[in-house]
Amino acid sequence: KCNPKNSKCVNGIRYVPINVVDLAGLVPGAHEGKGLGNKFLDSVRTADVLIQVIDVSGTTDLEGNPIENADPAEEIRFLEKEINEWFTDILLKNWTKIKGKNIDSVHSILTGLNISPEVVDHLADELSLPKTRITWSEDEVRKFAYKIRERSLLILIAANKIDLPNAREKFDKLVKEFPNRTILSVYADGELALRKANEKGLVKYNSGALDFEMLANVSEGQRSALNKIAKILKENKGSGVQETLNAAAFRQLELITVFPVSDENKFADNFGNILPDAILVRRGTTALAFAAKIHTDLAKSFLYAIDAKKKIRIAKDYVLKDGDVIKIVSAAK
């Protein structure tokens, strides 16, 4: 049995923590500074992926006001447009630093957005834009900015309120309308209710599970409410909350889970804790890069690593796999 330090293990399921930030809401014209647009867009700079929570039932407008039969597709298009225009504005406002120069000048303007020179270069080629003595038109700048957004900022859609009338029909329509987007149906109210009930000892529930167990101390009123939640959970194949986080981490960002240990025979740290840490890294991460993530000194004095499952030595350029248990061996100081 594992003894997690940086995460938790519930009924054999390892839950690895990630940083989730609740961003300020957007209103139309956010890229021009309206509302809290600047605060939101500044936060986007450091995000690996965005989860856009929309009202799939169509009972609120773009500013969160109650309304009847709104089109949830408008929410998706609205956010995409605002971020696209924000990327465009960044380039246009700095155009004097780009005009007449080469593609490196474009990358220098976009460095705060974690966009590599290779991506900038590739997208310019994809759009057949000149990369020396740049004189792109405003339309070409806009097309380039849109491509940059598509490549650098992943947006996943959490279609919430799936339990309300007409929501399922609207959800199915969204999936057809945006075939290239990741859209998940979410029942956040149900997830919250079950987590609270679990804390109070009324149910046994693991986040992400398709059902739950009611315990003996549940009142008739609580049983009735929980039965309704169970019905929706079954129809939706879960609440969708954990599934959304999993999709963001594993599908969008292509993360894998790797377990560092000090004792490759017992899968433990120096204190005997079994699989104490679970670390999320990008698919394609090497043993050396993993060592650097644990501590920079480990990477500097890296000798080799050990695959604890196979009991074999692995080199610094070994590409890690999901579920690997790894010991890093470094030179003694």
Question: What does each model-identified segment do?
Answer:
Residues 68-78, 86-109:
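Single-stranded RNA-binding surfaces
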Residues 45-56, 81-88, 163, 179, ...:
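Non-catalytic alpha-helical coupling and interface elements of nucleotide-dependent molecular machines
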Residues 95-322, 329-333:
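C-terminal-of-GTPase-core extension/linker across diverse P-loop GTPases
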Residues 1-51, 57-77, 135-146, 333:
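Switch II of P-loop NTPase G domains
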Residues 48, 324-326:
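Structural signature of the urease/amidohydrolase superfamily beta/alpha-barrel
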Residues 51, 61, 90, 94, ...:
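Secondary-structure transition/capping residues
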Residues 42-45, 77, 81, 176, ...:
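A broad, structural surface signal
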Residues 25-27, 55-61, 69-73, 84-85, ...:
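Conserved nucleotide-binding/hydrolysis micro-motifs of P-loop NTPases
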